[in-house]
Amino acid sequence: MMAVRPMCQTTTPMAALPFRLIAVSGSSMLPTFAGGDWLLFRTLHLRDASHLQPLLGKVVVIERESYPGVHFIKRLKRIDDGRAWVEGDNVDVSTDSRQWGALQPTEIVGQVLLRYRRGRASE
């Protein structure tokens, strides 16, 4: 399972910020992302599946309704009946829709835009 931690504490509600920076922990997205990588993501406020289509194949940030405050990094693989099917790139160790089932669109809270890895920026 790949979870992330916020870079810093803030008094501004995180949902109000258009971009966030988080640190990666875990190995479920190897080789794309590794523990210690920093990710910049654009926050999303999806209310229904109509906005999922442009995210297909992209890496998204998930906040499960059953795990509030915990974020997961996964790739949006497909849309099933208006729900998001996500998987980690390292399928042998990833906990994802294969265990959770498809997610509500509201559980997709961001799209990863940029990675900072060990001293260099990359996409």
In which residue ranges do the predicted regions lie?
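Extended hydrophobic leader/signal-anchor segments used for secretion and membrane insertion
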Residues: 1-123
